[in-house]
């Protein structure tokens, strides 16, 4: 009798991704269906009960032993060791790919219960289809290719139509176009999402998600129909897997090109499946809002900011529609649901604030319209359906760390409203008081952090060891969160100091009235150096991911500040006339860090290219305009008395100036918003002279005044763009290679000085 006839296991060799040994896939014939099925291998983990009794565990939930004896089946958390994780993902990826391939082949089989005619009529109404077919320019091949492209890109969703055409007793798993990965791979993806993308965004209850995921795999295993709760959580599961796949490929070596591409494709397919499973016009449950939030993270880490802003807007408005911004929404029925609502709202709201600060858009809801409480500082394990066990006072939970981050983003939002408002006022005494108050709020926020969340003093060191990546720093679970917190703290400081950065080239001895502005500009330089030092420490400890937009944006922004300073110095516009060695070294180190992060993944490369393109778009125009204006100012100062007015005008308004110029003011008129007022030139000099190419002096003409005013009008338009459209990026992207002394004079009209403020 042959092995096939006897039903004994049949072995077939499968090639491993790593190593020379073959991995054996054992198949056995099912007695009921007479089909070959994989034999259950050794479980990756054993439950607590099996390990205590030292028996073999089946790896299920509940496992065979616990189910038989009615024990409580619990598992420890998956291992967090990065090297183990990398090795397991690489070892299992071939099995994962083969399983996915088999399931995709199975999905191609005919399902006789689907009414394909109804599907076609729903997608293409008969009258419209007849008009298309009757057209003289109709090409059947192009028509089919277009449909195929739309299906692959997720623009054409036929899943809903197919689901409606299936009988009610059809198992739901047959309706999913993208199968779930093996459970072990799914758990690794979820853990990767939590450890990389959601360190400072706790919007979920981990045990609940894991429990639902296990129930889905159990339903798949036994061919059961999904429950309503499982159906609702399906988009959330796929969106979490998408982000996990996006970050997982960074752990693989660059030589594993096929595996990295596999993770890229899988992440995108999971994202499309999550998007196609949602009805964005009718978001009414918490799971759907969580799914949209995770899709927002996926888009942001893929550098798709336009779609990211749209998705976070949908999530915020869905949360508002459900009343999550009000304390009255906390009505149970369980403490888990109440805490999840609070966590979800504050995560969505602070991400919306962050995106507004980056893209220069107004906030969707004001802070004064919110009375929702912050989530409790307790770990997920201490929250159950019957009550909450409060946290040990000596520790802080991950949710407590997220509360600290939320308070920081709220301060950043207040800074943005004051410093980047369309109706910003001149820098008078009350404005300076507000700026100092915001700076104190940031300092107080950091001072009130628990000691365990405070980083060691960050000082830039001129001599740095070679930039190499080591294993993850697992000495403390607080290491990565506290450094990410401090990175966003430094970003908030830069957002506060950035509007004064143009004053970096002014010598306070020449213009003592600008001491406040110059001090703020110098602070911006120091904070940028701290960002570079902190990112260097994080990347050497393997705590920094190239796909994590929040960190790479902050680093890129800091490098832009330092490069602008270096350029200004090389042009001879900085008072000391040479570049400080620590600034020059920090600039080079920052560039090396960005280059290393750029090569981490395709998402990292795209993020780098998006930010780098913002430099190039504004560099040429600002450089030409600033050099022209700077030369004119120098000529005027040479011909004037050389002394600046003691009291600078404080009521200048660029919009008013531009409007008056367009109404045809003559050059002999000198209103308060005239060119000389903006440039801080003596008002009594009505006959300022210019030197032409033949060294012949002549008085200012209307054409020259018009030309100068045109330059100022263009600067006003540019100033509006860089401070509103993308305030955190375009501003310094434009300033790489720019002469800014003229721009400093322009800003002086907006921010008047007061020597009494230190």
Swiss-Prot record:
GO CC annotation: nucleus
SMART domains named among the record's database cross-references: Fungal_trans (SM00906), GAL4 (SM00066)
Pfam families: Fungal_trans, Zn_clus
Induction cue: Weakly cell cycle regulated, peaking in S phase.
Cellular compartment(s): Nucleus
GO molecular function: DNA binding; DNA-binding transcription factor activity, RNA polymerase II-specific; zinc ion binding
Key words of the record: DNA-binding, Metal-binding, Nucleus, Transcription, Transcription regulation, Zinc
Principal subcellular localisation of the protein: nucleus
Top-rank taxon: Eukaryota
Signal peptide: none
DNA-binding region: 47-73
GO biological processes: DNA-templated transcription; positive regulation of transcription by RNA polymerase II
Assigned protein family: Belongs to the ASG1 family.
Name of the protein in question: Putative transcriptional regulatory protein YJL206C
Organism: Saccharomyces cerevisiae (strain ATCC 204508 / S288c) (Baker's yeast)
